[in-house]
Amino acid sequence: MGAILGKKIGMTRLFNEKREAVSCTIIQAGPCFVTQVKRADKEGYDAYQIGIGERKEKKVSKPLQGHYKKAGVAPGFKLAEFDFKELNQELELGSAVSVESFTEGEKVNVLGVSKGKGFAGVMKRHNFSGGQRTHGQSDRQRAPGSVGGSSDPSRVFKGTRMAGRMGSDNITVRNLVIFKIMPESNLIVIKGSVPGPKNSYVKIVSTKK
């Protein structure tokens, strides 16, 4: 049982013991280091802040440079917080977090930000049917239709489905199975797809059930 921060490399197909092709996602989960230990008496809650990767110091702002130096680790690309219960182990400031805390066949939850689709209409965003394509109709094929009554209630209700920005939502995919772990290269291979585009960062947390 554990938790770690990873970078989505992409998808591929691998073969299992039954020689069946399985779609998998490859995640670069490391090197990860503890950059801050938050305590309830000081920050108000218990959590580990974890950073991933190493980047040039000049690419990081001065406040973050001091933050990383305090932890005694090199500047990273991304920071994320995990609850004490999620990591299920005692960690000190600057200590490494490895993929070896997971096991092959273990179920995990993957948290990430979905792909952004930009401004989308109601047919793409909410799966509306659109208007009829005959009987004199000329320009209403992809229109949303009525959004409310005129005299009563004389307003548009909150939450009415309309066109707008689609995607870039926080998504949690639960109970994915770890297909393979490669500790020497800090890689985790997970069955199925995970949220987000290539090179996006995801949190991998063992399921509580």
Swiss-Prot record:
Signal peptide: none
Alphabetical keyword list: Ribonucleoprotein, Ribosomal protein, RNA-binding, rRNA-binding
InterPro entries: Ribosomal_uL3, Ribosomal_uL3_bac/org-type, Ribosomal_uL3_CS, Transl_B-barrel_sf
GO (cellular component) term, any one: cytosolic large ribosomal subunit
Biological processes annotated in GO: translation
Its biological purpose: One of the primary rRNA binding proteins, it binds directly near the 3'-end of the 23S rRNA, where it nucleates assembly of the 50S subunit.
UniProt region (Disordered), positions on chain: 124-156
GO MF: rRNA binding; structural constituent of ribosome
Cross-referenced HAMAP family: Ribosomal_uL3_B (MF_01325_B)
Pfam family, one: Ribosomal_L3
Family the entry assigns: Belongs to the universal ribosomal protein uL3 family.
Gene3D superfamilies in the cross-refs: 3.30.160.810, Translation factors
Name of the protein this chain belongs to: Large ribosomal subunit protein uL3
Keyword Ribosomal protein attributed: yes
Coiled-coil spans in chain: none
Subunit structure: Part of the 50S ribosomal subunit. Forms a cluster with proteins L14 and L19.
Domain of life: Bacteria
